Regions:
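Exposed, low-structure sequence patches enriched in small/polar residues
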Residues: 1-285
């Protein structure tokens, strides 16, 4: 649904036994053939996008997502001179609601050990994301964006790590863009993640200078200041230089990379800890 100044969308899905691989003995994200997009928001800010990203569970899940986007009227006390954009998002993923069968006594040998009640939420919650993003242009040079994210993350299910507590995290982001002069802009991010589980609290700072339309240089530092083990309260600094041209981005980075799961477009992979140079090329077709 959409009309001037407001728009909304709702997505609901239910999948069961969609683990289609080139080698059926593999697991996690290895050798997947079919693409199963997650019905969750694809966050772009570092802490929300890289610490606890969600990927669809191919063995079965029920997922839903609701988006609401509205723009407050410009030249008003509540909308400001240029108007204010507000985006709300809610996403949820649950296990399947199933009815179990005893295969030994079942005369139908082709029947599975359970039947699925499609689109009904099972007892086990896999993931939940509630977030709001507010964007306001203050003047011709200054734009501010603020975000709040509340996450629930079932680490045992999503990452296959047994004995881990469910993650309950709050994330806040402040993004400030200032145009110094034509084709030159500086952007600063301040991010915080607070949780009592897993590795504890994180902070991230980003500063980026752009020479439009092609070049940019950036510095980012992640700090795991809330880790329960003082030996792991580490900084992860990284500097980057990039060039954009005709839908292609070439970027060279140097710094410390923490271990974890990184997702791009719903495709996730495990990345080991490293310290060194990285060269990446991203193309849009």
């Amino acid at each position: 649904y959409s009309q001037k100044g407001i728009g909304s969308s709702f997505t609901l899905k239910s999948i069961d036994n969609m683990s289609f691989r080139s080698d059926r003995t593999q697991s996690l994200t290895n050798l997947m053939i079919n693409y199963l997009p997650a019905t969750t928001r694809q966050h772009t800010y570092n802490l929300a996008a890289t610490l606890y990203p969600y990927n669809t569970q191919p063995t079965g899940e029920v997922g839903l997502q609701w988006d609401l986007i509205g723009k407050l009227k410009k030249k008003t006390w509540y909308g400001g001179k240029y108007g204010t954009l507000i985006a709300l998002n809610y996403s949820l993923a649950h296990g399947l609601d199933t009815t179990q069968y005893n295969q030994i006594s079942d005369p139908d040998s082709t029947r599975m050990a359970y039947t699925t009640n499609y689109f009904a939420l099972g007892e086990q919650k896999y993931f939940q994301d509630i977030n709001i993003e507010i964007t306001r242009k203050i003047n011709k040079k200054l734009k501010i964006k603020a975000s709040y994210i509340n996450l629930f993350y079932n680490m045992e299910i999503v990452q296959g790590l047994g004995g881990r507590d469910n993650i309950k995290a709050n994330i806040a982001v402040l993004d400030v863009l200032y145009k110094i002069k034509p084709k030159h802009a500086i952007r600063v991010e301040a991010q915080g993640l607070w949780t009592e589980q897993d590795q504890g609290d994180w902070a991230t700072g980003v500063i980026e200078y752009t020479f439009s339309p092609h070049w940019f240089i950036a510095f980012m530092d992640q700090f795991n200041y809330g880790n329960a083990d003082a030996n792991y309260r580490l900084h992860y600094p990284i500097a980057s230089l990039g060039f954009n041209k005709s839908g292609n981005r070439f970027m060279m980075s140097y710094g410390r990379q923490r271990a974890g799961i990184f997702c791009v477009g719903g495709v996730c992979r495990n990345v080991p800890a490293s310290n060194g140079f990285t060269l990446s090329i991203t193309s849009s077709f």
